[in-house]
Amino acid sequence: MPEPAKSAPAPKKGSKKAVTKAQKKDGKKRKRSRKESYSIYVYKVLKQVHPDTGISSKAMGIMNSFVNDIFERIAGEASRLAHYNKRSTITSREIQTAVRLLLPGELAKHAVSEGTKAVTKYTSSK
């Protein structure tokens, strides 16, 4: 029985490498689109809290989604507060109030104190 003709070998199952830069007809390389995420910041905080602990790419994706979700909720609430008070600028006060409204009890208190500390550090460094 003759064997079927084999085409180019299929990439290995674990291989996730893809062609990043494709050649165009005129010889120029196409620029790879940048994907923004909070992963480097999540990693820095993880190393501050647990220096000997790592994080999987799946867990990093979940953390990135979480940070994006919280950011959108706080920004939306702060925008609503500014609109209610007929203001066109979102200040740290709107952000603080939005955090108090969105986060429960003790978590809101800690978030507000850390935020205040960060704003103070930023203004003193200017």
Curated annotation (Swiss-Prot):
Report the residues modified as ADP-ribosylserine.
7
- Region feature Disordered, mapped onto this chain: 1-35
Glycosylated position list = 113
Cross-link Glycyl lysine isopeptide (Lys-Gly) (interchain with G-Cter in SUMO2) maps to 6, 21
At what positions is PolyADP-ribosyl glutamic acid found? 36
- Residue positions of the PTM N6-acetyllysine? 6, 12-13, 16-17, 21, 24, 86
Low complexity composition bias: residue spans? 1-12
N6-(beta-hydroxybutyryl)lysine modifications at: 6, 12, 17, 21, 35, 86, 117, 121
Task: List Phosphoserine occurrences by residue.
Answer: 15, 37
Known SMART domains for this protein? H2B
In-chain residues carrying the UniProt-annotated modification Phosphothreonine: 116
Determine if Amino-acid biosynthesis is one of this entry's keywords.
no
Annotated positions of the N6-methyllysine modification: 47, 109
Positions of post-translational N-acetylproline modification: 2
Which residues are annotated with the PTM N6,N6,N6-trimethyllysine? 86
Q: Name one GO molecular function term.
A: structural constituent of chromatin
Q: Which residues carry this modification: ADP-ribosyl glutamic acid?
A: 3
As stated in the Swiss-Prot or TrEMBL entry, residues carrying the post-translational modification Omega-N-methylarginine are 87, 93
In this chain, where does the modification N6-butyryllysine occur?
6, 21
List residues, modification N6-crotonyllysine. 6, 12-13, 16-17, 21, 24, 35
Q: What does this protein do?
A: Core component of nucleosome. Nucleosomes wrap and compact DNA into chromatin, limiting DNA accessibility to the cellular machineries which require DNA as a template. Histones thereby play a central role in transcription regulation, DNA repair, DNA replication and chromosomal stability. DNA accessibility is regulated via a complex set of post-translational modifications of histones, also called histone code, and nucleosome remodeling.
Family the entry assigns:
Belongs to the histone H2B family.
Do you know which PANTHER family this protein is assigned to? Answer: HISTONE H2B
Subunit? The nucleosome is a histone octamer containing two molecules each of H2A, H2B, H3 and H4 assembled in one H3-H4 heterotetramer and two H2A-H2B heterodimers. The octamer wraps approximately 147 bp of DNA.
Instruction: Report the protein name in the record.
Output: Histone H2B type 2-E
Query: What is the gene called?
Result: H2BC21
